[in-house]
UniProtKB/Swiss-Prot annotation:
The chain crosses the membrane at residues 1-21, 33-53, 60-80, 95-115. Keywords: Cell membrane, Ion channel, Ion transport, Membrane, Metal-binding, Sodium, Transmembrane, Transmembrane helix, Transport. GO terms for biological process: cellular detoxification of fluoride. GO terms for molecular function: fluoride channel activity; metal ion binding. The gene is fluC2. It is a multi-pass membrane protein. This is Fluoride-specific ion channel FluC 2. The keyword Ion transport applies. It is found in: Cell membrane. Belongs to the fluoride channel Fluc/FEX (TC 1.A.43) family. The keyword Transmembrane applies. Na(+) binds at residues 71, 74. It comes from Staphylococcus aureus (strain COL). Na(+) is not transported, but it plays an essential structural role and its presence is essential for fluoride channel function.
């Protein structure tokens, strides 16, 4: 039961962090790519890899930080929405593919680097 509470608390903080980061980057930068989602997903992927690589496995930390906070910070559903919204009548296949590759391949590389630090 305690791990469920830790996931809920961590997830809440992660979602708040994502919202703040998204607001900041959406006001500071204009881009055809959704930069804020890219940043939170890449940072989250790196931190997940780092946490796993460091074998931080106290009884509470993975539930609170990895599943909760980083699960709330990163967002696959927003990525799916953004990719769907790119498929408009003015669909740009290069933009769509570049953003997809950045998210998935660079996200994996970020996790891998974090794991091996």
């Amino acid at each position: 039961m305690i791990s469920i509470i830790l996931v809920m608390i961590g997830g809440g903080f992660g979602a708040i962090a994502r919202s703040a980061i998204t607001d900041y980057f959406n006001h500071k930068f204009t881009s055809k790519l959704p930069i804020a989602t890219l940043i939170v997903n890449l940072v989250g992927s790196f931190l997940i890899g780092l946490t796993i690589g460091l074998s931080i496995s106290t009884s509470w930390f993975p539930a609170f930080f990895v599943t909760g906070f980083l699960g709330g910070l990163t967002t696959f559903s927003t990525l799916a929405k953004e990719l769907t919204l790119m498929m408009t009548p003015k669909f740009n296949i290069n933009l769509f593919l570049n953003y997809s590759l950045l998210q998935f391949i660079i996200g994996f590389i970020a996790c891998y680097i974090g794991y091996h630090i």
